[in-house]
């Protein structure tokens, strides 16, 4: 039996980590692929898995979220619009499915609703100003 060296131990650990990472990525992708039985993206105009609409008052601020109609280039959130007191909060969905906003872009959250709540927390009562469009 060959002697166990540091090089062999690190090589084996790297191989195990790569195998575990591949399996961890492949399993959710396989589950998600067969998990959207509904109308196609072309039929609805929205991406599968688009978050549900919401309209609530959070800490005295009205936050709303809904699929954006026709916002292909303006909305990087996969066609989803978030409003705080009627002013649009620019949101974007990351490749991993998390969401960020222009107010709290270093703190990814799981949903647009959570992004709106995080923005309200960060604003601390200040008014949200419209994001300038170029």
Swiss-Prot record:
Pfam families: MelC1. Gene3D superfamilies: protein ne1242 domain like. PROSITE patterns: TAT. The keyword Signal applies. Keywords: Copper, Melanin biosynthesis, Signal. Residues 27-76 are annotated as: Disordered. Predicted to be exported by the Tat system. The position of the signal peptide cleavage has not been experimentally proven. This protein may function to deliver copper to tyrosinase. Belongs to the melC1 family. This is Tyrosinase cofactor. The gene is melC1.
């Amino acid at each position: 039996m060959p002697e166990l060296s540091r090089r062999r131990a690190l090589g084996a650990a790297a191989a195990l980590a790569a195998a575990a990472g591949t399996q961890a990525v492949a399993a959710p992708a396989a589950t998600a692929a067969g998990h959207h039985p509904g109308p196609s993206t072309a039929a609805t105009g929205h991406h599968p898995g688009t978050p549900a609409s919401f309209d609530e008052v959070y800490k005295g601020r009205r936050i709303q979220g809904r699929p954006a109609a026709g916002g292909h280039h303006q909305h990087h959130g996969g066609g989803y619009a978030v409003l705080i007191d009627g002013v649009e909060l620019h949101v974007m969905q990351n490749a991993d499915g998390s969401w960020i906003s222009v107010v709290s872009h270093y703190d990814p959250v799981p949903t647009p609703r959570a992004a709106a709540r995080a923005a309200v927390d960060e604003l601390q009562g200040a008014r949200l100003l419209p994001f300038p469009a170029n």
